[in-house]
Amino acid sequence: MAVAINSIFLISILLFCDIKYEVSDDFVMSAIMSGAYGDKPNPHLIFINILWGYLLQPFYYILPQISWYLIFQLALCFFSLTMISYMMLQKLDRVMAIMVIVLLVTAFGSDAYILVQFTKTAILAVMGGGIVFVWSLFEKRPLKLQLLTGTLCLLGTWIRFDVIYIAGGFLLLILVIEFFRLFRSNRNIKKHIIRIICSGGILLVVVVGCKLWDIHAYNKDSDYKFFREYSQARGDIVDASDYGYEAYEEQLRKIDVSENDYLMMRKWNFADNQFFSLERMKKTAQIIADYKRTVELSKEALLEQIQTRGIQGYPICIACIVLTVLGITIQKNKYGIRLSVWIVGFIYIIYFFYIERVVYRIEYAIFLASFCCILYFFEEYKGKSKEDVYVFNYRYGIIILLCLILQCVLYLPDRSYQEIDEQSRKEYIETFFYESWNYNPCNYRKVANKGAKSIGILNEIEQHKDKLYLLDFQTTMQVLYYEWNPFNALPKGAFNNMLYFAGITTNFPECNQILSNYKAEQPLKALVQENVYLVDSDERTLDQKVKYLQEHYYPKARAEIYKEIDGYQIWKLYKK
């Protein structure tokens, strides 16, 4: 039944909803995996363990037209939800189990399926595999189930290792409570405890071992090692809070970073390894971090930020509240456990607000982990009478019906895309999808894979392979990737004459090779070359680039518009 429920749900999503990547990171990694940068599938997936890349690689050789990167993420979400569903069907009576499964798949499953994002996929696999793995150990379930769920948990850490720091807090809470229960039981538990510790220990060792293998795989290649180090420094700058150049001016001046240089870093325009060297990027990141430690964030300001974020209105938060109320109603003697789960979840939320790393995918991870933890402690309701059981089953039915009605709303796609043409396509995407780090309920119904597309700019690039096109991050990174259907793999070498000016692929070895092919190893300086063009529709970032060239290389540098296609402006820069 677990397979049947989740199959029906996934098929309905595939038939009626517009599946897309929530953030551009997934698109870039799928492009790398397909061989768009270079001439063959590449398992170096930046944020994802290289072992996952090796797992996908054979499929790209067998059927290179299909985006196996997306298919495998959808499959992992499906198996994770199915495992949780299986556990609940084993623990609860059928009506109650179906109710919590429907609540799970409508609140969390639709989110993970429609807006695919690797962090959400990872937390689903780690928590789904983790709680069923723990349950199977304590309940002495078949070894096959333990191996299956342990593997699921492991694959989740391959997708995004860092989710274990969120999942770990909730899984630790489950373990503490389970061991406490075990010690309170008057049974011979020594062998059972040893078996649990050994099984969990083996899984933990394998997880850490795979992470170490990933680190080794990058470190053994000097180019990939440099890429990882540069990416770390880049992330420490662009992901940090921005208090303005004035806050760091004194220290930045000491390392010869002007206000425009600083803005270039912040606006993802650090495409010059000579000036934006690894050493200077690290020093800049350290200056920002040092200043951050001197800034005090009051409790009132922190709570106000949480309130204005509107977390309490997220469907995933409401689902956790509904599950908590149900749990307290059914099992009044276990309200302490549910309170503990909420405390752990709130601590995580406060922590991420404190470090100012507030994005929806992290909030999703926290609420999913909370939901799974609350779900784990649900037990079959044994009413005092048949009438009592009937009343609760009636309530479950109401919840199931409400969830299904709300789910059906997602199956009614927004048709505003039909009014969009090639010229207004860019504005349409920017309006609804640009702020991918925030929750927007419209995005689940908005359609990006149908209707008119801005293929004019892509055709221009494709038809001029002798030219190198550098795409400004602010202009293209958050919008242009919607022009490709996520189910289709990009052809090998598709990006061999177009690169993001600076972004998560900066100093990626295959990208550096493309730059080398056009003798543009320093992209900023190379903008004045005859065969290098800039796609930039933001006057502010364009002016920053021109000013950078004037400050560092060409005092009389200037930019002229070359073409404008579908709202994308192509510029040619000159020395004078």
Feature names for model-found ranges:
Residues 145-163, 172, 200-209:
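Membrane-interface alpha helices of multi-pass inner-membrane proteins
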Residues 42-76:
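Short hydrophobic/aromatic helix or loop-helix immediately within or flanking a transmembrane segment
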Residues 94-99, 135-154, 194-195, 392-397:
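Short hydrophobic alpha-helices at membrane interfaces in multi-pass membrane enzymes
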Residues 166-204:
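Perimembrane helix-loop-helix junctions
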Residues 191-204, 382-416:
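Signature aromatic-anchored transmembrane alpha helix within multi-pass, membrane-resident enzymes
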Residues 75-92, 321-329:
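Transmembrane-helix motifs of polytopic, lipid-linked glycan transferases
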Residues 210-251, 407-502:
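Membrane-embedded, lumen/periplasm-facing catalytic core of multi-pass transferases
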Residues 6-45, 56-61:
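Extracytoplasmic loop-helix module adjacent to an early transmembrane segment
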